[in-house]
Amino acid sequence: MNRNFSPAAMPPISSMTIDNSFSPPPSSGDLPEIPDAWYGNIQYLLNISVIGLLCCVSIFLFVKLRSDHRRMPGPSALFSKLLAVWKATCREIARHCGADAAQFLLIEGGSFVLLFSIAVLAVSVMLPLNLYAGTALLSDELSKTMITHIQKGSALLWLHFVFVVIVVVISHFGIAAIEARLKFTRFRDGNGNISDPNANSTAVFTIMVQGLPKNLGSDRVEFEDCFRLKYPGKVYKFIVPMDLCALDDLATELVRVRDEITWLVAKMDSRLLPDEYENVGDNGLVFCVCSLWVRVKVLWSQITERFGFTDDEKLRKLQELRADLESQLAAYKEGRAQGAGVAFVMFKDVYTANKAVQDFRNERSRRTGKFFSVTELRLQRNQWKVDRAPLATDIYWNHLGLTKVALIVRRVIVNTILLLILVFFSSPLALISALVSAGRIFNAEALDSAQYWLTWVQTSGWIGSLIFQFLPNVFIFVSMYIVIPSALSYLSKFERHLTVSGEQRAALLKMVCFFLVNLIILKALVESSLESALLKMSRCYLDGEDCKRIEEYMSPSFLSRSCVSALAFLITSTFLGISFDLLAPIPWIKKKIQKFRKNDMLQLVPEQNEEYALENQEPSSNLETPLLPENMFESPRFGDIEPMSQDLSEYPISRTSPIPKQKFDFAQYYAFNLTIFALTMIYSSFAPLVVPVGAVYFGYRYIVDKYNFLYVYRVRGFPAGNEGKLMDTVLCIMRFCVDLYLVSMLLFFSVKGDSTKLQAIFTLGVLVMYKLLPSDTDRYHPALLRSIQTVDSIIDGPVDYEAYSHPNFDWDTYNNR
């Protein structure tokens, strides 16, 4: 692929179908001369994106508002609704939309403030510095705003080093401030209030012990004595669930066998009825075909009977299998089944629960050379893994009991597939590059002729910007925003994590890796696949004199192309991507489909009102419903069929987890936001214009997501607090983005800095100091320990862990007839 063109220019699809019949392109005298045009025609891309933004906002104002609010609001009503969205507090978001939504908006708002602070400095200081103090010879105006306008080894680069230090300081304190505000959302509502009864959680008193023997379910006296002796008078309750994973598979298999028996019996009974072809006349083509079909059926039945494959034999085997499965099910009903290898220990106060976790972690770190007693060996004490228990509503209870080997095999398969995709098909454009290479093998002259035409099209302003910047970025945006996140989410579900938050963290890490490779590394290297980049980098080691790849990456032309490519993607994502989310077309389409189904015979209840005007809500209004309906376990297949009579404002609850299903994919949006954050941070020193665009992205998205949470994704049933493990991962990745920024500046200063390499050395020192800065990793805010003293102040009724770990067999109506 020729890289002498626009940085965002992708391998053209049309060039694969062009043959030698092309006429020569226009002569050079016919081409317009654009000596001072912006590199890559960014002004045209910006105009196209603004037009798309205005179209989406118009559709929102004149179409979407009617769908969200039942009728078109007037100007005053519209202003009041938007003002209510702006004034909605974190506590209201957490109470009505859940803690995940509150944390998501806190991180978005904090990212906006952080990037806005950097943008003010970048636009007011670094942009004029690059534009007016630079002396490097560049051909376009946009490149003059970048760091490439400053000559190699210039003393002005020390100002860029000072800017790097300021950016790191702002990022550190900004991320720390976000983390401090997020502390209050752990197990509590948005402001850390304990007054909300739905925010109270028994998880702060509970620890989870993994690695227990599975035969502990029937005899757990020794296990309980181990904790009672270690913490006398402090243990409140032990919950040792059965192997619910095996029970889930058993129930599914039993239902399938019963269905097959019912179908087979009905099939055998149908043979006693008169043949359906007896009423057919004695002549004609239909009679001949029916007679032939009857003879074939008779012949086939004789063959299967001779080999022992009769329906009677199949029915006998199915009945034996059903009897065996029912005997296994009886063991679960009587409490004789094996355990899941997991136990929940609930203490009477938070201090003892935290102390128990620390004690077992310290014992695990000093386990080398330690001897265990016979009782401890019988309990497999050396394999215990003790940690704070996740929320009961966060656990996939049907995954309890899955063996460690099965988990490892599943994760190895998923990570291997992901690694192969990242290397060989990391970008959707890799397929286009492969097709272009194949086309050059078959007809190279046609592609060369097409290349001249492409050169002419690129100089045509609007057309070139539309084809080589707008459409490729839209293509990347759609594939990275819709197709790939869905595939990675399914891969994360295949891993069968123990908790919903664990599954979200796995999906988040996969998406972030995929986005970093595609939207940062490959776009920075102007490559279509990671395989191609690795092959070209390897030549530096095979032929060092002929290859200076690192210096080429830091050359003015290459760095300018990379910066413009990042800026083009940021503009497209900001103006078009967020405007697409403002319309929220997928929930709107589902709502329309539901309206068409409202007259279905399966819907036996009237449609409920879905309008939730924030300004009309009173604190006493019934906005929350119980997480578990009484008929949750009515059928082992409840999670496969969504009840038609369910209100759209309530998420359906599956049998796999008592937490409502999330229609807003937090992992996907976190991953995309983190990619934009990383893209903005990495290019903040190279191209100061990138920073205000990134700040506008987070500010615009904060407003749009806040509206969608309150009027589109506003649901019942989500707890107002959680343990915050997902946001810990997000904050860790944000700090890693700062590391990437320092590494990129370290590479730049090592190539383009002063001759003594002092700038590179000092940047390395800043990186080391930043990694040594302390971060608050404690998951519990001190106010939480002071506000909650004993478990008795929280528990009012059955313990949630105990209720969820006991399976309900009401679905087994076969033996209750």
UniProtKB/Swiss-Prot annotation:
This is Hyperosmolality-gated Ca2+ permeable channel 4.1. Disruption phenotype: Accumulated 12S globulin precursors in seeds. It is found in: Membrane. Belongs to the CSC1 (TC 1.A.17) family. Pfam families: PHM7_cyt, RSN1_7TM, RSN1_TM. GO terms for biological process: protein targeting to vacuole. The gene is OSCA4.1. One of its GO terms (cellular component) is membrane. The keyword Calcium applies.
